[in-house]
């Protein structure tokens, strides 16, 4: 799935991208939408989020980890908990458990937490295709 957000500065792109990332990380796509994945093992390895600047990439990573932590602790300060509960049609304790598992996976495998810049992404592609590109 490819998801593109185009908008001007200050319009909430990062907020929306963090929500979409969490929905993909914690959910499973079905014909009718998303349902909660109660075993989100290594889902972070299957997601690539790309932005323009290193600052934006670091901010996105920070917000994703913060939100996972808030949801895992069932904090009322989460920006996305209610929206995720509604999107998945699930109970808070189930979302909390999935967030705990996903947070542990992300933190223990941070090098595969793929939020990067466009430049970094293409550098990786070119490095991996160097032989074929000549």
Model-derived segments and spans:
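P-loop NTPase Walker
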Residues: 1-132
């Amino acid at each position: 799935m490819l998801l593109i957000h185009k908008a001007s500065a200050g319009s909430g792109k990062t907020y929306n991208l963090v929500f979409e990332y969490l929905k993909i990380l914690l959910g499973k796509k079905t014909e009718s939408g998303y349902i909660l994945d109660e075993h989100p093992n290594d889902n972070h390895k299957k997601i690539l989020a790309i932005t323009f600047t290193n600052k934006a990439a670091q901010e996105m990573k920070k917000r994703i980890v913060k939100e996972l932590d808030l949801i895992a602790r069932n904090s009322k300060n989460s920006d996305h908990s209610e929206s995720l509960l509604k999107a998945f049609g699930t109970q808070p304790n189930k979302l909390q458990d999935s967030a705990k598992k996903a947070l542990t996976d992300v933190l223990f495998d941070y090098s595969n937490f793929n939020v990067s810049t466009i430049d970094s992404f293409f550098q990786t592609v070119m490095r991996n295709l160097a032989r074929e590109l000549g």
